Amino acid sequence: MLLLVDAGNTRIKWALVDRSAPEQTPGKWLQQGSVARAEAGTLIEAWRGFSIGRVMLSNVAGHELRGELERAVLHTLGTRPVALEWFASAAELGGVRNRYLNPTQLGADRFAAAIGAHALFPEGPLVVATCGTATTVDALSAGGEFIGGMILPGLGLMASSLAKNTAQLPQVALQSTLTQPFADNTDAAIVSGCLAAQAGAIERAVAAQMRTYPNLPIPCILAGGAADLIAPHLSIDYTRVDNLVLIGLHTVAIQHSPTC
């Protein structure tokens, strides 16, 4: 059994893959789950009883969580001699070439998501928007190169920063049911502005790719916990994909092992 783990700033997602299956398809797994970052210790129980023979993890949430994950995995493995494979960005991996000036500086989650998106849509240029604690909007070339991208505060972080750093603006509950861009009350105006900023960044990225590839379709892949809030405010076509980082990890695991 292959265990895949995506540890983000807010949640930890995981999936289990049957390594004995004759055909391996990225994103096809036996079981999956998700816990809040503070609940990392509960993963021991979630993974109990599975015969895990390989582990691949992505972690962007710091050394403390990495240690917690290591303890949880090692407790699950018991005496089985299984090495933990920590995914990290590289110059080329999983069929994607990394054009970052310093390829190792690219966040592991962004590179894994790009690999996952390319595995699902291998035929042309892409925009990959992952909407979480931070929103990242990245571009892939028609040849499968990670060109680069944008990083901006996520929807929740954007709204909370207004409440924290201004004297009279409140903390608002985020929702996507706004029907008009020009709100007639302060709470709705904050939500409208934050949603417009997120949607605008994504649409701007797609427009840039369209200028580069005027004769090709530009699929926009939308992922992350806040994607469903932002999606109704996009004026472009998009494809909603869950667990994009896990799909990227699975892609790498398949390509770098004869049995998985």
Curated annotation (Swiss-Prot):
Its EC number is 2.7.1.33. GO terms for cellular component: cytoplasm. Pfam families: Pan_kinase. GO terms for biological process: coenzyme A biosynthetic process. It is an enzyme of class 2 (transferase). The active site is at residue 109. The keyword DNA-binding does not apply. Belongs to the type III pantothenate kinase family. HAMAP family: Pantothen_kinase_3. This is Type III pantothenate kinase. It comes from Janthinobacterium sp. (strain Marseille) (Minibacterium massiliensis).
